[in-house]
Amino acid sequence: MKKNVQYKGNLLILGTAFLWSFVGIITKAVSYNALTVTGISSIMAVLVLVIYNRKHAWHMTPLAVWTGVVIAVMHICFMVANKHTTVTNTIVLQYSSPIFVVLYYRIFQKKKLKKQQLLAVGACFIAMVLFFAGELTMRNMFGNALAVLSGICFAGEFYLCAKPENDAVLAHVLSHIICIAVCLSYTGLFVRQEYDWRQTGLVLLSGILCIGLAGVTYTIGCRMTTALNANLIAMSEVIMAPAWAFLLFRERAGSWPAAVLMVGAIVYEIWFEAKEERQG
């Protein structure tokens, strides 16, 4: 891979992480219900994806549908978690996903875990315990639990989209359609919501840029750089989102030792997998 191409790919992934880092910030900043935010932003995100992939040959399969459901659950859990716990806790716990990918391969494909993988998995679960032990309210614990579930589904997205017979583009489009149907139906039936144009505009912008455009830049960037670079650079979101949360809300992580342990374990796991792939 040419260095200038890889450099551009790295910049695209960094830009993606920058856009992603504002999703939780905007969700927490507006007064709207989290499901309302998810539904409205998904409208714009699906429009961006459909326009960008207008020449895509769509292949509707049960696998694509199930993948869409998993991604939709991931989006919903992530958005709701941001309303119930800190932005830092939410993003760090969601990025536990590589550990769950390892477990999926062990459970569904019977791949034996190497000692390095067991070490990373163990460290992540210890970090999760520390996150929950540091929370004194049921509200924050509920948010942390949703963030973990978001990470489990995020891992499911990677695992299912990697299957060659799957139509990952269709799965992502379906996920946003599901979010629109479920979230806006719930909002219409059960949520008394007062809207104003500033907050609605912010949520719409989030859907266009932070979800829709970010999905496009991530797809292009991954084609132009290595898997290791893409994973590690995308993880800069774990630094950016807490920084914005502190600057805007003076919000701190529930447990910095847990956050450092979690991020360290995930970086180690990504590095180990890349090393194994290079060695064949």
Residue positions per predicted region:
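Hydrophobic alpha-helical transmembrane segments of multi-pass integral membrane proteins
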Residues: 8-12, 34-51, 117-123, 142, ...
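Juxtamembrane C-cap of transmembrane helices in multi-pass membrane transport proteins
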Residues: 19-32, 76-85, 93, 156-167, ...
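Helix-helix packing/entry segments at the starts of transmembrane helices
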Residues: 90-96, 161-178, 211-247
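Hydrophobic transmembrane alpha-helices of multi-pass small-molecule transport proteins
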Residues: 42, 46-49, 69-71, 103-104, ...
